[in-house]
Amino acid sequence: MWRTGGKTALRVKCEKVATALVKSPNIDPRHACFQMEIRESRIHRRGVYALEHIPKGRKVIEYTGERISRRETKRRGLGSITYLFTLDNYWTIDGAIGGSGAEIINHCCDPNLYTRIVRGHILYMSKRVIVPGEELTVDYRFSDKLDPVRCRCRAKKCRGLINVKEE
């Protein structure tokens, strides 16, 4: 981040573009800033893993997909497997259609990524240094108004549920 005119601005472009992602054709190099791959995860089915050192505070990947309305979100949310990310009060991004690979990043109560929404783009940023071979994780923070979803992250700080109490 840097300061401009007294305001803090967020750098949204990648420092470099990830290339040579032959191990995981499901990762879209247009939206990934570092080399990563998809493989089996101890958290849930498949996960996304760093293939190179990722410094703290950097854009790692953009969550992309089809932009859908709340009504369509409710319809698609009835499925057993969904990749829905709420953008704002009206729009949701469905990573199942046109996803960058970020939709496969698993939940953890003590994640190494955090989310930033900048000008309608959902960015996953590194919360700390990430080492090669480490699984990329983010806190999904599902609403407590939704059905409880059991967490399987095994982190020391695990809440037991992916849901968090809304304030």
Residue ranges of model-derived segments:
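C-terminal SET catalytic tail plus cysteine-rich post-SET Zn-binding segment of SAM-dependent SET-domain
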Residues: 2-12, 109-167
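Catalytic cores of histone-lysine modification enzymes
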Residues: 10, 17-115
